[in-house]
Each structure stands twice: as structure tokens, then as C-alpha cells.
Amino acid sequence: VLIRVLANLLLLQLSYAQESSELVIGGDECDINEHPFLVALHTARSKRFHCAGTLLNKEWVLTAAHCDMENMQIYLGLHNISRPNQDQKRRVPKQKFFCLSNKTYTRWDKDIMLIKLNSPVPYSTHIAPLSLPSSPPIVGSVCRIMGWGATKSPNENVPHVPHCANINILHYSVCRATYGRLPAKSRTLCAGIPRRRIGSCLGDSGGPLICNGQVEGIVSWASKPCVHNGAPGMYTKVYDYTDWIRSIIGGNTSATCPL
């Protein structure tokens, strides 16, 4: 019954996160010391960040495949766009890796990209990695989202500092009831707070969904406008790709993602 109610309440137009321009809706400014693994992606011609990502070690960043762009610049150790941290660093990609050696992905599968930096970054107060998941999150888990994405939608208001919010892992059937066009199974996580407007928005794409101190998800896509009527968001399920991630980082660049 609950699923049917949600389906009736949440009549939405689908859009990839990059199309709906997501930032954290309903959140507050992150503490400057709580996100040393959070990176910002943009191009020199962009006036705001295009996407976010997660630092896995000194040379590797995890983000969404749909965040790929030409002339990408990667900022690490950043908090306030207007006031750089002393240990802030900038890098560019040396190599990019996708599941199928190309940018083939869907709303429910393979929206994941690994970036090898052109040179390692030193760890510091504001630069440190986040661990890959040791197990998938369970329904009901409280998880953390963060990013420089829009704090309002559809009239986007982009902040100078990252915003953070807590959301819950929901049963996949909730997202299926909300969006209608999803397959019976997918390598994604459904997360949000039903009937509350808290979630990711423009600019948050590629950033982490953090559960128990591990990166469990990658911001992939959501409703348009963001979190419309409390609609949940979809996140790439990192646990399903851990073998591929470790293989690529370990030097097996021909590794393929799970089918």
C-alpha cells in the first residue's frame, strides 16, 4: 500500500543528475574537517563545479561516468571556493577508466568512472582517502551525502561551500514505484527521506553516498526538479564494482565490470 501511495504522490519527470543540476537540497554546510576525501570536478570555462568525486588513494578518484568532460580539472582539499585552504591541490586526469572501456552506461547500470591523477597528492589535514565498502548497506541505514551542488531547485542556488545531509537507504521497490521505468534488478541504491525534500541536486553528481564511514554509493540521477515531493535519488552501488575498482587500481587495466 505504501508503495502505491508513493507512486501516486511522486509523478515525476526523470532526468540524469547532470541534467537536473543537483546540489544537496535540505542540508547544511559541511564541517570543514569532515570531507577530506571529497573532490570537485570542473573545466576552466565553467563558473561552477560540474561534479564531485571521492579520493580513494593518493592517485585515484571515483566518480560517475556521466561526469566525464574535456579539460577536466580536479580540486582536492577544497572547502570554500572563495577562500582556498593552504593544503588545497589541483590535478588533471592522467587516465580515465569506464566499465566497458567507453562511456556506455544507463540510469540503472555502470554509471561509474575511475580517474588516475597526473601526479599523486600528499595527504594532509584536508586531503585523505575514503574506504571502499566491505559490505553493501542495509535498508534503513543512515547515510551521508555532500557536495557543492544546488541548494534550491528548479531555481538553483549554488553555494561557495559544500552542504551535507543525512538520508536513508530505501528498498529498491520504492524507487521503482516512484519512477516506473526501472528494471526489476539493478546495480543501484535507492536513498532519500520519503515526503521530505532532502537529497542531491545539480553539481552533486559523482559525489559519495557514505554509510558507516565507507563510500557505498555514487550520486547518479534523480527527479527534476530535485527531490520533487520528496522523491528518492539513485546512486551507483559501489559494492558491486569493488572487484573492478581494485583490479584497475592494481594495474589490470583490461578488467571489466560485472554484467
From Swiss-Prot:
The active site is at H66, D111, S205. SUPFAM superfamilies: Trypsin-like serine proteases. Its EC number is 3.4.21.-. PROSITE patterns: TRYPSIN_DOM, TRYPSIN_HIS, TRYPSIN_SER. CDD domains: Tryp_SPc. Residues 18-23 form a propeptide. It comes from the Eukaryota. GO terms for biological process: proteolysis. Residues 1-17 form the signal peptide. Glycans are attached at N80, N102, N155, N252. Snake venom serine protease that may act in the hemostasis system of the prey. Belongs to the peptidase S1 family. Snake venom subfamily. PANTHER family: KALLIKREIN-1, KALLIKREIN-RELATED. This is Snake venom serine protease rhinocerase 5.
